[in-house]
């Protein structure tokens, strides 16, 4: 039960899913076993033992680097000055401004980042950054969702893939028909020499 609580904390950040509540709620215990048996696949097994520790570690945020330390206040300031500017555009502007700073101007933020990294190492001595691939994140999200939601999400992805393949097949077929329609007509009438050759072959 404790291992399941560790797994569910990665999805639901609420006290309702604490181990004590699970032990006192029979319905929740039944739903937990249902989700674990129906949603988890062989590629992403249910997290127990060592796997639960990895799940806890994945939730730990990386320490901020110098750019993130500098851009926190700059991003907030730019968003207030340009309320209609999209976040992606703000990020581009911040990246450009950071490159334009001198090493002396960047140095205080590097020092602050080093302090934060030292505090992070002290708090999480066994932390190792593990980047996730987007495709694996999608499959893992299916395994962590309730069975009904996971099946609907995964079915939608499969349906979109089938529709894409069908559209490609239809486009190829219509393109072939268009090319065949522009070919010169085949003359089925045979010449007199061909007819004589055919009649001679028949007599033989």
From Swiss-Prot:
Post-translation changes: Acetylation of Lys-136 contributes to its nuclear localization and enhances its interaction with KPNB1. Deacetylated by HDAC3.
A UniProt-annotated Pfam family: HMG_box
DNA-binding region(s) from the entry: 60-128
Example of a GO biological process term: sex differentiation
Subcellular location, principal: nucleus
Keyword Repressor: yes
MF terms (GO), sorted A to Z: calmodulin binding; DNA-binding transcription activator activity, RNA polymerase II-specific; RNA polymerase II cis-regulatory region sequence-specific DNA binding
Compartment annotation: Nucleus speckle; Cytoplasm; Nucleus
Residue stretches in coiled coil: none
Family stated for the protein in its record: Belongs to the SRY family.
Protein name listed in UniProt: Sex-determining region Y protein
């Amino acid at each position: 039960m404790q291992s399941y609580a560790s797994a569910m904390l990665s999805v639901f950040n609420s006290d309702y899913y604490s181990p004590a509540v699970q032990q006192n709620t029979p319905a929740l215990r039944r739903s937990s076993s249902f989700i674990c048996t129906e949603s988890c696949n062989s590629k992403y097994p249910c997290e127990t033992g060592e796997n639960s520790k990895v799940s806890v570690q994945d939730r730990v945020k990386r320490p901020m680097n110098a750019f993130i330390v500098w851009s926190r206040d700059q991003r907030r300031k730019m968003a207030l000055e340009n309320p209609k500017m999209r976040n992606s555009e703000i990020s581009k502007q911040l990246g450009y401004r950071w490159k334009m700073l001198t090493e002396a101007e960047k140095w205080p933020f590097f020092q602050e980042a080093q302090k934060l990294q030292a505090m992070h190492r002290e708090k999480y001595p066994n932390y190792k950054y593990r980047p996730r691939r987007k495709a694996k994140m999608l499959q893992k999200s299916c395994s962590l969702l309730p069975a009904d939601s996971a099946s609907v999400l995964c079915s939608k992805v499969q349906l979109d893939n089938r529709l894409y393949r069908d559209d490609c097949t239809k486009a190829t077929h219509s393109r072939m028909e268009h090319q065949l329609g522009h070919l010169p007509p085949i003359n089925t009438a045979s010449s007199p020499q061909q007819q004589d050759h055919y009649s001679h072959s028949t007599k033989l």
